[in-house]
């Protein structure tokens, strides 16, 4: 797989908007997670966000929280998640971006964690509870192991903070479309249409928009507003958890294909 930055560069040269689906590792089970990574890749995902289940996921809405709770109840560990990445990453076109909270990183040791996930084949990291002020040590460790640390910009961030985050973020900038937690919503916040040009004034890095995208029409709207990537989480997780694992995988495949078509 190519790095996050390189992949975005090739997409931009082709005039394409990136599709970035999210799934929670271990929900409904580890075997389905492994299959889902392959199915999402085949269905057109340009990157795949893989969430490590965590007991106190402050940024996540009810759908992803419930998925994490189910995975943890089955005893899913980071080591099991990385074992899946190790097995499948070489078969995928889409780089895998690990979505994890900071505590597991701190617990293992920052450099040791980065070495472990990089060795497994992870290409990027999103750490939603890592504030900019405390990110330099994590950023340095990620860089030393060839990982892109993707930082989040909130819609309420003042201009100075937006500039600082945009400068520090690697791979792309994760623009949070709404205040609050993740979760599918019936419409995309119109403020995103105002925030994208504001970000463009301070950076030429790719911008991915997430939190609340639930259908192809919303994905298309974000592309029209100028997003370089569209991140879809809860709507994918919900489909994967519906019915039997086979039914969930089929639903995710169909949904991902419809999203890809919408932003083509």
Swiss-Prot record:
Gene Ontology MF annotations: tryptophan synthase activity
Name assigned to this protein: Tryptophan synthase alpha chain
Gene: trpA
Entry EC no(s): 4.2.1.20
NCBIfam families xrefs: trpA
Keywords: Amino-acid biosynthesis, Aromatic amino acid biosynthesis, Lyase, Tryptophan biosynthesis
Pathway named in the protein's UniProt entry: Amino-acid biosynthesis; L-tryptophan biosynthesis; L-tryptophan from chorismate: step 5/5
The reaction(s) this protein catalyses: (1S,2R)-1-C-(indol-3-yl)glycerol 3-phosphate + L-serine = D-glyceraldehyde 3-phosphate + L-tryptophan + H2O
Role noted for this protein: The alpha subunit is responsible for the aldol cleavage of indoleglycerol phosphate to indole and glyceraldehyde 3-phosphate.
Subunit text: Tetramer of two alpha and two beta chains.
Active site positions: 49 (proton acceptor), 60 (proton acceptor)
Domain of life per record: Bacteria
Taxonomy of the source species: Bacteria, Bacillati, Cyanobacteriota, Cyanophyceae, Oscillatoriophycideae
Enzyme class: lyase
InterPro entries: Aldolase_TIM, RibuloseP-bd_barrel, Trp_synthase_alpha_AS, Trp_synthase_suA
GO cellular component, one term: cytosol
Family label: Belongs to the TrpA family.
HAMAP family noted in UniProt: Trp_synth_alpha
Species of provenance: Picosynechococcus sp. (strain ATCC 27264 / PCC 7002 / PR-6) (Agmenellum quadruplicatum)
């Amino acid at each position: 797989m190519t790095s996050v930055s390189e992949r975005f560069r090739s997409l931009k040269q082709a005039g394409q908007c990136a599709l970035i689906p999210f799934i929670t590792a271990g929900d409904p089970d580890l075997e389905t997670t492994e299959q889902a990574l392959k199915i999402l890749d085949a269905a057109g995902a340009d990157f795949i966000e893989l969430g490590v289940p965590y007991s106190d996921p402050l940024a996540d809405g009810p759908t992803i929280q419930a998925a994490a709770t189910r995975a943890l109840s089955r005893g899913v560990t980071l080591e099991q998640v990385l074992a899946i990445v190790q097995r499948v990453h070489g078969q995928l076109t889409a780089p895998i971006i690990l979505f994890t909270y900071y505590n597991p990183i701190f617990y293992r040791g920052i450099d040791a964690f980065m070495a472990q996930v990089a060795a497994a084949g992870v290409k990027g990291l999103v750490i939603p509870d890592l504030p900019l002020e405390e990110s330099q040590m994590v950023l340095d460790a990620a860089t030393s192991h060839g990982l892109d640390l993707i930082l989040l910009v909130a819609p309420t961030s003042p201009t100075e903070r937006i500039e600082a985050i945009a400068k520090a973020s690697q791979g792309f900038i994760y623009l949070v479309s709404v205040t609050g937690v993740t979760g599918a919503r019936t419409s995309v916040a119109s403020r995103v249409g105002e925030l994208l040009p504001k970000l463009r004034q301070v950076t030429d890095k790719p911008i991915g928009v997430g939190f609340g995208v639930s259908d192809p029409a919303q994905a298309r709207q974000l592309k029209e507003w100028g997003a370089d990537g569209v991140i879809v989480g809860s709507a994918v997780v919900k489909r994967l958890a519906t019915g039997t694992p086979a039914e969930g995988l089929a639903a995710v495949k169909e949904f991902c294909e419809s999203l890809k078509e919408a932003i083509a």
